């Protein structure tokens, strides 16, 4: 195996990347290799999907399936080798279907097709042991023996950025949002990466294309969520537990949460959100259910202890999943969609009867805890509605600076930086936050500035779109560029969704972003220097020094 896609990957003076029997995330070498094979097979699918555009052959089923399958290879999503093989064999079938259809259409129209890429030539056998033997051909760092390390690093930046974008494409698709132009660009980029490109300039340009494409995808996802569930509105959420039977919903999929709420009505079951599902409590069409009672736990890296202590059924709708056998709750865990763990029950379709039966069979919480409320729901509409008041407070000198502090959380001790940063931020500053990094500080008290809360929870990681809209509105109001605003982004990264959001911000021209806790291992020192120079990206350091530098600028 060789995997270097997440922040927790092995980094020593002599080794970068997980290359032993098991990755730091818990996936086995077998699963890692199978995921590489799946990705390479998907690049072959995209080759033929791109060729199909030349002869007006577009198969919607394949367009919608391909990003979903790619999502299955994202960090902490699918650890089940059988499921990954199923995806890979389906990719092979779809590639053959596309090839036959496209070649036939090209013959009729006398259209010349491109020479087959290495990924398009990649063929899978049907037996598992024969499939795994192909792993060296499909390794994400293939060619590293002869190619410059900067080439490999930029290929991976593009691959991992596109993987994050694919995840958001699937989230949007679940809510009925697709875009043919986005599918076309996705296939173009995926197919091109399957040619093993070597030009550094073209690879850098590709990363910016991915960032801009993801901006459109985040807009689609925002549309899907608000059209389906209404616009988020500031709402109080209880972060303590209530007596009764219970179901915990984790991941990102609001559609699944809605189905669970509908199917548990009148059954005496309390439903809790976990992790990135916290913003659900601010959507009118979700918070209307009285048995959506609160948010349980914290960020994903704490789930093995928190899930073990949860006396009910647990549904994992997307990333991030950890080994459930550690806390001995695998028999109460259910996976959905692209998520998988060997031996854990998987729910196909929208029937959650098995989850409900499991919840009713568990003890549930035996008493009520004393309520503790936090506020969520400062989505796009809420932020835009507050913009005039915010502008007034800035002009009157009551608000001096804005910080966007958030992103993916993780278990490294260095991540306490984000807790300390928000605690030490000036009292006349406003802090926007999103994604699970918020759990580092979202239960702390920050007060308000003349009625404007100092901590504004924007939502999930993809709701960076809402924060961008606020920044654009403020820039217009103050007649300046985004980079001239008293606004600083302080981001934490862990996996590929964070990578693509960073690429989106770069592509939109946002500079001076602070990132941490460590730099991506797949980026060489030379590439980091290029990115730092081009985008003024900065690594987090000492909180006091960073704040001093930010406020002095």
From Swiss-Prot:
GO terms for molecular function: 2 iron, 2 sulfur cluster binding; hydroxylamine reductase activity; metal ion binding; peroxidase activity. GO terms for cellular component: cytoplasm. Binds 1 [2Fe-2S] cluster. Gene3D superfamilies: 1.20.1270.20, 3.40.50.2030. Hybrid [4Fe-2O-2S] cluster binds at residues 252, 276, 320, 408, 436, 461, 495, 497. Its cofactor is [2Fe-2S] cluster; hybrid [4Fe-2O-2S] cluster. The modification Cysteine persulfide is found at residue 408. It is found in: Cytoplasm. It comes from the Bacteria. [2Fe-2S] cluster binds at residues 3, 6, 18, 25. Its EC number is 1.7.99.1. It catalyses: A + NH4(+) + H2O = hydroxylamine + AH2 + H(+). One of its GO terms (biological process) is response to hydrogen peroxide. Keywords: 2Fe-2S, Cytoplasm, Iron, Iron-sulfur, Metal-binding, Oxidoreductase. NCBIfam families: hybrid_clust, PRK05290.1. Belongs to the HCP family. This is Hydroxylamine reductase. It comes from Aliivibrio fischeri (strain ATCC 700601 / ES114).
């Amino acid at each position: 195996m060789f995997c270097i896609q997440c922040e927790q990957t092995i980094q020593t003076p002599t080794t970068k990347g997980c290359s032993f029997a098991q990755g730091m995330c818990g996936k086995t070498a077998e699963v890692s290799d199978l995921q590489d094979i799946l990705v390479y097979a998907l690049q072959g699918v995209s080759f033929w999907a791109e060729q199909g555009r030349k002869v007006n052959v577009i198969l919607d089923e394949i367009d919608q399936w391909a990003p979903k399958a790619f999502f299955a290879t994202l960090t902490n999503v699918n650890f089940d080798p059988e499921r990954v093989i199923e995806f890979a064999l389906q990719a092979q079938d779809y590639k053959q279907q596309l090839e036959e259809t496209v070649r036939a259409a090209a013959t009729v129209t006398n259209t010349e097709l491109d020479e087959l890429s290495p990924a398009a030539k990649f063929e899978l056998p049907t037996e598992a042991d024969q499939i795994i033997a192909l792993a060296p051909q499909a390794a994400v760092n293939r060619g590293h023996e002869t190619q410059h390390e900067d080439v490999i690093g930029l290929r991976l930046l593009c691959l991992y950025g596109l993987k994050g974008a694919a995840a958001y494409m699937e989230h949007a698709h679940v809510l009925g949002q697709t875009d043919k132009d986005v599918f076309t660009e996705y296939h173009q980029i995926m197919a091109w990466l399957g040619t093993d490109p070597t030009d550094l300039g073209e690879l850098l340009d590709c990363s910016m294309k991915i960032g801009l494409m993801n901006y459109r995808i985040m807009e689609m996802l925002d549309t899907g969520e608000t059209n389906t569930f209404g616009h988020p509105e500031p709402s109080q959420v209880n972060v303590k537990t209530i007596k009764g039977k219970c179901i915990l919903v984790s991941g990102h999929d609001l559609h699944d949460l809605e189905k669970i709420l509908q199917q548990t009505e009148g059954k005496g079951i309390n439903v809790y959100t976990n992790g990135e599902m916290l913003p659900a409590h601010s959507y009118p069409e979700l918070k209307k259910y009285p048995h959506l009672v609160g948010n349980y736990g914290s960020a994903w890296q704490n789930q093995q202890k928190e899930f073990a202590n949860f006396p009910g059924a647990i549904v994992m709708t997307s990333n991030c999943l950890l080994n459930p056998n550690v806390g001995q709750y695998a028999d109460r865990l259910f996976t959905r969609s692209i998520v998988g763990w060997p031996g854990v029950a998987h729910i196909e379709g929208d029937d959650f009867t098995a989850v409900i039966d499991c919840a009713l069979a568990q003890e549930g919480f035996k008493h009520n805890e004393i309520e503790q409320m936090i506020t969520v729901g400062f989505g796009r509409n809420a932020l835009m509605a507050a913009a005039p008041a915010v502008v007034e407070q800035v002009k009157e000198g009551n608000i001096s600076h804005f910080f966007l502090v958030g992103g993916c959380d993780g278990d490294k001790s260095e991540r306490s930086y984000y807790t300390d940063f928000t605690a030490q931020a000036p009292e006349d500053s406003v802090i926007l936050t999103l994604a699970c990094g918020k759990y580092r500080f979202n239960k702390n008290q920050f007060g308000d500035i003349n009625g404007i809360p100092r901590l504004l929870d924007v939502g999930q990681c993809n709701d960076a779109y809402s924060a961008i809209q606020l920044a654009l509105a403020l820039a217009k109001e103050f007649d300046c560029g985004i980079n001239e605003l008293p606004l600083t982004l302080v981001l934490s990264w862990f996996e590929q969704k964070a990578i693509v959001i960073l690429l989106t911000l770069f592509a939109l021209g946002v500079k001076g972003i602070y990132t941490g806790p460590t730099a991506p291992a797949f980026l060489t020192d030379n590439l980091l220097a290029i990115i730092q120079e081009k985008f003024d990206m900065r690594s987090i350091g000492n909180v006091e020094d960073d704040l001093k530098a930010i406020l002095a600028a």
